[in-house]
Structure formats: C-alpha cells, structure tokens
Amino acid sequence: MPSENFKADQGMLFCFAKEEIKVFWMPDTRFNLDIFFLGSDLTVLDIERNLPFYRGFANPQKIPRTRPIKAQHVLEMRADSPLAKKITKGMKLIWLHSKDLNQTISNAHLSQ
C-alpha cells in the first residue's frame, strides 16, 4: 500500500511462523511509525514509538530501524494515530477477522 494511502485507523500486521529477534525498518514512508512487537497470542511485548520516517530507498544504512526485539508478529501503525496511542505494553490485541489467525498464518507459510 502506498504510504500516502495509509490512514490513521489502519495498520499493517506482519505475521511470522515463529518467535525470534526482529528488527524493523520502513523505507519510503511519509510519516513516523509506532511499531508493536507481538507474541503468538497477540499480546504486546514491546513498542517502538515514533520511529522517524525516511523518504526513498537511497542510503539504506541511514533508514531508521527498531532495536532488536524478540516477537512473533509485528504491527505497524502511524505514530499520529489516536488508536496507536491507546495500545500499551501487556495489552492483548483481538483478531476479529472471520478466519482464524493461526490457520491464516499456516496457509500463508505453506503457499510460499
């Protein structure tokens, strides 16, 4: 999704098969990000708030990154999102989609 279409009430959920150390960065954004590191049950394990934006892909070494954090899933939201500001460490997020999250993740990893 182009970053200019990324609304304050939206997020991007990155799902992984196992919990391990993650470092996130988002080149070519036009707004700062709040990045939520989640356990397998979607409990917020850690948060990186207000990660600075970086336009383009030039000079990858200059693109801001999170510190290394152990997590299974990662949620990115705009740092200026009122919803993101309400999410705190220890909070458990709830998956509301009609398909089970674990089954969705399993199917996605099988198709890769």
Residue ranges and their predicted role:
Residues 1-112:
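Compact, glycine-rich, soluble single-domain proteins
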